[in-house]
């Protein structure tokens, strides 16, 4: 009979003839429960770090050791040799300590690194521990006989124990699942049971009457009670710890999942390139429930990158996410990181990826880019984009041989619409202009807005110039001439155009735009509603006016302007009763510049309102300082008259300067009224309510004068000097002056004669009951310092009529 056969025979004989099979089953059940609990604890120990790991390891070793120990001694109680037996307390307890120590050491080695070598080494330690515990326990066994050991069978038992423990660790692996825990526990239990009963079959008891069993030894019943109690408490404690930890982990996991699902970003956990878990946001992005995603490959199928290693840690990159249920690819930003909570290693090999949907960001970036390149109101290219596009267009035509024209456009009636109807009306004109320009040009030509009411069209065409540009310019003039409906009325439109051609008028974007602007300036001088091509002779003239406009703007800011005052005298006695404020400009290098030179420049360049406001403030401040309460007359430009803020400005100036409202006289022309008749009358009524006097200037040169006098109670009428200077020279002029003076008497409106230059004119006007006189015959315009003879209290203020025939300013 071979050794194997002999061992099997002795094992079966030992079990069937020397053991109580019921207790054998109990021992096996205790062993199985203990081993299963051991692997439950082992899985927790592998998933922990630091002090927590050490605590789980200690508990694992204690439960495993007590399970082996309990199995051994319950099986020993089942052993019935037919002799009196007992157990040494010291040896019994020492065997428990040996079992716990070896078990803890074996599991520590197995979990130190995830490898077959570690599992094998740990299994050997555990198997040897089971053998050491068994034979230490056998040393605590006392009976009335001599124990004879069969060493080959003893060796076989140790091999079975080591083999069972090693197989258990190899099969269980990390023991993450219940199934693996059950397999590992069952295999370890089998190894323990096989070692025990094989070892028991290795002994033969030779009865010896001389040997006695001391009464102080543990009996079988006492041992069963002690072992059962201790082992039950340890195993139940281990199971309780596992249950508590599992519940805690589930609660924490649920909290984490809720937080993850509340996150705006998609979160996905990947292991070996496959989806392990994901939050609700990621599922929504992919368009599939979590159950369909788990186990699917993430990279390549759902998420693609340009990088070769998409799961590299702590790298932020952009990629494309492909929804599972159709739809367009979604641009995403992905940040990946290895999972590590600082205490657990269950996440070993797992990578968490935060996936952010970039569609809104891309849309916002595109909008920002669009706004940076386009005008916010009209949607046309803005000035910066125009420069780049025009430079690119020049490169294109240089290579292709096409022709290029730059057309500068200015709206003729924009300012009037803006002033009369408000900014909404102005915006409506700009938007409609942009729409018409876009409909008039086709790619590769394009339109842009420079700012205000200035637009640019860049024409790229294949025809001959200037014919092609002239055709487009004429078409634009016609298109922009049609009125624009707004708020139940039609706003007047119209435009002036300046055209420059490449390369004749410039080879750079800056030169072409500057020359087109000069041509536009000439078009506006020609009466508007026309287009003009750039010509070299325009350059010097227009540049001079541009320089003058620039200097005037700076001059207003630097207080280079001064106000001269021309006296007005009562016709009856010649006493000065007031002054008219007349602006003068003393240029730092050019000297005095006549008003006829810089006033038109101010009107053309939008400076007239600022100029008028400055004169109003300066004149009121000067007049407030005079000792005599003489009146001060200030001219209002049409733009000022139609500005809704004019009454507020006048009120503020009067308060600031301290000038009495009755001393301020505002002069307007008839032509200024009719640009927006109703708004002008509203402003005049508000000014009258302040106590300010209103005079109609240049009476007789406009139209509908009588209806104007009927509509508003003017305080004064000023006869234009073109009639006064022809008194006694032309009968019609004399008759007109006499008629106006008669009209003033009938309406009880004082009349002032402008441009009085001779004594003969003074005598005629005095004879016709003219109220006041103004002109060189009365006094020249002079700075405020030269007025003291009239403005100082106590001075009679009368002037002697002059016969010099000079033109008044």
Swiss-Prot record:
The protein, known as: Uncharacterized signaling protein CC_0091
Cellular compartments per GO CC: plasma membrane
Gene3D superfamilies, per database record: 3.30.70.270, EAL domain, PAS domain
Domain EAL span(s) in chain numbering: 545-795
Compartments, record wording: Cell membrane
SMART domains, sorted: EAL, GGDEF, PAS
Main location: membrane
Short name of any one Pfam family annotated for the protein: MHYT
Domain PAS: 254-317
Domain MHYT: 19-206
Transmembrane segments: 23-43, 57-77, 92-112, 122-142, 152-172, 186-206, 224-244
Residue ranges constituting the GGDEF domain according to the UniProt record: 402-536
Key words, A-Z: Cell membrane, Membrane, Transmembrane, Transmembrane helix
CDD domains, A to Z: EAL, GGDEF, PAS
InterPro entries cross-referenced by the UniProt entry: Biofilm_reg_signaling, EAL_dom, EAL_sf, GGDEF_dom, MHYT_dom, Nucleotide_cyclase, PAS, PAS-like_dom_sf
UniProt organism field: Caulobacter vibrioides (strain ATCC 19089 / CIP 103742 / CB 15) (Caulobacter crescentus)
Protein's membrane topology: Multi-pass membrane protein
Signal peptide: none
